[in-house]
Amino acid sequence: MNAEVYNNGSRLALGASATTAQWIGDACYFALGDGRVRIVEGDKDVIAQAHGGAILCATPHPRSDGLLTGGDDGCIALTLASGASEAFAPALSKKWIDHLVASPASGVVAAGVGKQAIIFDDGIETHRFGYPSTIGGLALDAKGRKLAASHYGGATIRLALAADDKGVSLPWSGSHLAVTLSPGAEYVITAMQENALHGWRLPEKTDLRMDGYPAKTRSFSWDKRGRWLATSGAESAIVWPFAGKLGPQGKPPLQPGQRQALVTAVAFHPSEEVLAIGYADGAALLVRFADQLGMELDEPGEGAVTALAWSADGKRIAIGDEAGRGAIVNV
């Protein structure tokens, strides 16, 4: 296959590892491991120095056209399309800002710092939630009301804007890392330290177990309807079916995009059953579920794909890797 980046895309030399890529309107923001944010919009290409150290996480601001980034400098920065960068929460902590999630539906922003989730409403810190151990991951539901946090021994669900909410505990022994909520908040899924997923169906708290991965899952992506959950951590994407009351229990996953390289990133198209898959060797593919038709977005490079993001209209996809190679491909 000829890589689509050469036919209908553009290559970018990012200059540092890509922490994440996010589309905000027509602008693509690459958050980088050296503290910079690179903004590409048409012919415009702007670089902002948002942090003094590495950017560890990023999410679009829920109320403005800008990107929120968390760094190892303990700060949260807001970078606009113009390249202007300002403090959203300066010197928030001496600890790293490991996780950031936000919701345009509710306006809430949540930052994971050590054992605390710090909640912002309209840009103002309102309260903090404590957890029994360091937070492994944060996730909000589609309405931005429920906040899931993973930690040692399970996960906890809270109403994000209810400062006195004691939370719903979802126990399961072991270390829980990344976490995701299904679009309708019926399922909470965590990545475990031992190369497996654990999940709970709500409100019954029914336990789900999904194992057999050769590596840890670090990337999740739900399709728009919440019928499929794509995951990384194998030599294909592992896509679990969540239609029906029992979710994936007793059902085999789909395994699109089989290659001799670990999948490191997955991203569903915003409206169709089309999955973008990034690999440890730097390659990226597109697979359509209806006929398993594949398209090579980019060829292998020198580093694992760490960033995959669709534009809202599903016509462009951004790719970034840990070696500093980036691309925007029209599909």
Task: List each language-model region with its residue ranges.
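WD40-repeat beta-propeller superdomains and closely related acidic/aromatic-rich repeat-like regions
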Residues: 1-331
